[in-house]
Amino acid sequence: DEAKTMLGRTQGNIQAIRPLRDGVIADFIVTEEMIKHFIKKVHKRSTFANPRILICVPTGSTPVERKAIQDSALAAGARRVQLIEEPIAAAIGANLPISEATGSMVIDIGGGTTEIAVMSLGGVVYSNSLRVAGDAMDNALISYMRKEYNLMIGDSTAEKIKKEIGTAIPSSNNTFLMKGRDIRSGTPKEIELTEKDACEALMPILNQILGGIKEALENTPPELSADLIDMGLVLTGGGALLKNIDKLISQDTGLPVTIADDPLSCVAIGTGRALE
């Protein structure tokens, strides 16, 4: 979080880098250093720690992308590296009964990807990975501000808008005082944004997620589809915290939608349980 707040604010000789983008490695060297840092935080007393590591990957990641992740972890000092697909980890963390003979559907809206999966009897019946999620929402807000208000804003400001007034269905008169740089004059400028503005900016991304969910439902076997009427759909990931996103998905699919307890931590919790 400390590094994230530095995005767009660093000195000329300092560069803020995202090691991962869209759920896969964007910078091999920085990813290796990041994993080394995490290992040191866990094994504070051991200089020669070489732990077993379990890493989540998007279901749509390629064999090359998966190997790159494993290679980074091994280079960082891991003794053994295993991979788990994100929706499985999310479902475990959300306490879904994936080992039972009933169908469960999880929608994990993370930073780089949205993972959609239908599971039953401990396996994945259908999965889809969309490379649109929280980061794409931020980019949509940046583009909207530029197009509608000639205002240039950064990633951290876009994320703040998303958290403050971002919504899938406008339901209040909440506003947000937006500050940025006027593209034409180059001077600082501020405008007042409404929930309706934020929703309009986010809707193209939300429509892609809705399309992915519909595709998953169309590819679900009839027996499991019947289970989903009772079980509903479960949302995890930071994107699940977007206001009214559960209502939007429920309206679009006609199915009950619930947000998991502590959606931000579901993938991490599920990965930890799987490692045990």
Q: Where does each model-flagged region fall?
A:
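Nucleotide/phosphate-binding catalytic cleft detector across ATP-hydrolyzing
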Residues: 1-109, 117-234, 240-276
